[in-house]
Amino acid sequence: MLRRVALGLLMAAVAGPAFGQAYPNKPIQLIVPFAAGGPTDVMARIVGERMGKELGQQFIIDNVTGAAGSIAMGKLARSTPDGYTIGIGHLGTNVVNGAIYKNLTFDLINDLVPIALLPSNPLLVVTSNQVPAKDMKELVAYLKANADKVSGGTAGMGSGSHIGVLAFFDGTGTNYQLVPYRGTGPAVQDLIANQIQIMIDQSSNSLPHVRAGKIRAYAVTAKQRNAAAPDIPTTAEAGFPGIEVAIWHGLWAPKGTPRDIIDRLNAAAVAALKDPEIRKKLEDLGQDIPTPQQMQPDAFAAYQKAEFAKWKPIIDKAGVKIE
């Protein structure tokens, strides 16, 4: 009898943290790989706040900038896999960086566990108001004639804006000097001030400034016009088919995070994107919202691997590598 009691106490002590406390019982840190005010940060705050309500715990934003998101993803990969540190990233941070950075100390596929696919964001071709071009064809002609005078901003090598630039260069035959920033928020401010002249930027970041008349939009890099900006033509409509890029986002946890916690976080993310108020906020920013089936961890993991297979040859062809 005493032996059974002792064994029961031992099992309770071992299982106590897992079964004695419901997850989550404290705030959750959400690592954001870019500066405050950029599109990834905005999405993290919108979705994270609603997920926090669903889970009954606050999401604390941790902006970790540098190396186009690789520093943030490295921090996430090294975090304790207990569900209290997760990260938001996108096509650039969690796919393209794996093809660009030769000396990453972690594996984007094997060291991070997908939680949920989040909305995707088409890109806008935008310039400062001082660029004298009325449409895409005039813009391309201007860029070719002034390649040595024009500079464009990105959120760093491998960022969504950098991916857009590579597709833009390939589809238009243009080239110009690239200026890396620690996020597109600061870059678009320099675009407004004409410190840089062009960006291929996520619509959620640029569209408010286009609407305010602070910058000019020429095309959206999608198959169809964006419902949030139906007056902006697609790149194909503007005369440049083949420039189609959407920056999808997602949530990840460190490898080793228990599956029941992954599923709990996924359910909270799905609930957040079903909320009509949240959907409207994201759609007003030009975001395309995935279905609950697309958001599931296993479906998202398969999609991430397929995207890596798609983009690695493109990156290799462009010769973009960072030691």
Predicted segments with their positions:
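Extracellular/periplasmic bilobal clamshell ligand-binding domains
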Residues: M295-I322
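A ligand-binding cleft/hinge motif common to bilobed small-molecule-binding domains
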Residues: T93-N103, H162, A167-G171, I198-I232
